[in-house]
């Protein structure tokens, strides 16, 4: 019996090693292949004075991006595409109020592949992609192949192979591919970026990021809408499937993939999967399709990333549990810590005018002088307009403002294709780690060792 158990243990251990080594070999294969294009880390294209944009997906996120884009100077909407006719016509009617230049807008709906027809017929400069997760990679790849820059909702892709395909296509076509991580444009995130750049909290050591947002109500969206497809991801996958809202900002605080440091490995663990099944059991008939699913994804996932410099980043995801919203947004250095939800600061020796030591947080009105001195220049310039326009407190508008500004002036984007893939890679890597009882997973280096020559993100004036 002892020998039998030992054989089973060896067999299971070997399977885990094989699975991990297979992923590693796949990553090394891509790493060792020379790129057929040019590195895109600091890429800038020639200025586009009048940006002709098409939109794919007009359900949840698309309408907000459409409004923010269309209200900016130098923009023209040339096509709208969605599975559903009412979404397309509703946004077309709204568009007339936003942008008088967009008079000849082509409308597409009804067929799963209408977006491909749209790309061929309209030939836009840029395409905004706001669809279900599985469509992100094929849509951004085809967009670039058809000659347009791609701007995609999060996550950028759901497998590392898709991410390599995106990187290779971007390098080959010399087209931007930006995953639109809007949280990087939040007021507090911009403030913290500025504080980190100015060395206020010393050498950066540790970060904590999250997307904890109870979204069980989306299961009401059963035939169309986010819940109609996202619920199946909860059932079929187990890991951190939505890492970038919390991770994007702290990665840029740390200059991850931008000349200073890079993610190295991740370990991941999930709790039991209980909340979705209990919610379905309570709210739907026994034979309802949500009660026929076996929910695989744990209610809460916790992942821990190790960087090349030895820093640590904790990333959590929970869209199921009854608890308040948070993204953590914590960055810790040798002389202080910045944290979110609520916004608070602790500095060695205290925050001037607020606290006497690092043993208590400065928060609320006590942070007024810190905002006054260290407010990010971009928020000083556009923040009031962004808050008026709305979209998650103005962060959505600021993101679109910067996209348009960079394209019109021929500047590098604030988020490059490698960052979008790296941040999204926590998804499939965490799934692999959870499946292997927390075994470390190596991050692919989508830059092929060129990250250490990439410039840090500027503090944009």
Q: Language-model segments: what does each one mean?
A:
Residues 1-148, 164-176:
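N-terminal glycine-/serine-/threonine-rich beta1-alpha1-beta2 phosphate-ribose binding loop
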Residues 292-295, 301-305:
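Short N-terminal edge-element motif at the start of the domain
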Residues 12-16, 30-41, 64, 322-461:
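C-terminal helical cap and adjacent loop that interface with cofactors, partners, or active-site loops
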Residues 57, 172-178, 183-295, 328, ...:
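Predominantly a Rossmann-like dinucleotide-binding segment in NAD(P)-dependent oxidoreductases
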Residues 303-309, 333:
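Active-site beta-strand termini and strand-to-loop segments that position acidic
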Residues 10, 66, 92, 116-119, ...:
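Non-transmembrane alpha-helical segments in soluble domains
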Residues 147-159:
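ADP-ribose/adenylate-binding Rossmann-like module
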């Amino acid at each position: 019996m002892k020998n039998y158990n030992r054989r089973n243990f060896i067999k299971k251990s070997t399977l885990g090693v094989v699975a991990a080594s297979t992923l590693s070999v796949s990553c090394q294969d891509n790493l060792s292949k020379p790129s057929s294009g040019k590195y895109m880390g600091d890429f800038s294209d020639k200025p586009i004075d009048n940006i002709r944009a098409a939109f794919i997906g007009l359900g949840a996120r698309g309408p907000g991006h459409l409004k923010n884009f269309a209200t900016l100077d130098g923009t023209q909407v040339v096509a709208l595409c969605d599975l559903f006719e009412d979404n397309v016509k509703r946004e077309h009617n709204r568009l007339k109020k936003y942008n008088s230049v967009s008079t000849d807008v082509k409308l597409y709906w009804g067929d799963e592949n209408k977006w491909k027809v749209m790309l061929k017929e309209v030939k836009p400069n840029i395409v905004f992609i706001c669809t279900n997760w599985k469509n992100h990679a094929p849509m951004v790849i085809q967009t670039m192949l058809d000659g347009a820059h791609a701007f995609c909702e999060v996550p950028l892709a759901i497998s590392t192979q898709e991410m390599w395909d995106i990187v290779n296509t971007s390098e080959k076509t010399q087209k931007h591919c930006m995953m639109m991580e809007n949280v990087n444009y939040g007021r507090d995130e911009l403030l913290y970026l500025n504080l980190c750049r100015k060395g206020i909290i010393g050498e950066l050591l540790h970060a904590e990021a999250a997307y904890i947002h109870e979204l069980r109500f989306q299961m009401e969206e059963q035939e169309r809408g986010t819940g109609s497809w996202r619920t199946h991801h909860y059932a079929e996958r187990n890991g951190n499937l939505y890492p970038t809202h919390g991770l994007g900002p702290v990665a840029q605080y740390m200059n991850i993939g931008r000349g200073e440091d890079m993610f190295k490995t991740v370990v991941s663990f999930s709790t039991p999967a209980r909340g979705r099944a209990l919610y379905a059991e309570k709210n739907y008939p026994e034979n309802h399709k949500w009660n026929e699913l076996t929910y695989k994804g744990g209610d809460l996932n916790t992942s821990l990333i190790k960087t090349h410099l030895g820093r640590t980043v904790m990333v959590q995801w929970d869209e199921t549990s009854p608890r308040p919203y948070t993204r953590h947004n914590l960055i810790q250095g040798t002389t202080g810590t910045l944290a979110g939800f609520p916004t608070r600061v602790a500095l060695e020796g205290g925050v001037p005018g607020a606290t006497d030591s690092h043993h208590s947080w400065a928060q609320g009105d006590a942070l007024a002088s810190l905002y006054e001195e260290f407010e990010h220049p971009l928020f000083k310039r556009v923040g009031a307009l962004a808050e008026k326009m709305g979209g998650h407190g103005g962060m959505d508008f600021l993101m679109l403002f910067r996209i348009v500004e960079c394209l019109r002036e021929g500047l590098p984007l604030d988020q490059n294709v490698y960052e979008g893939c790296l941040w999204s890679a926590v998804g499939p890597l965490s799934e692999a780690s959870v499946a292997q009882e927390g075994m470390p997973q190596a991050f692919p280096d989508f830059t092929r060792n060129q990250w250490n020559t990439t410039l840090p993100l500027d503090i944009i004036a």
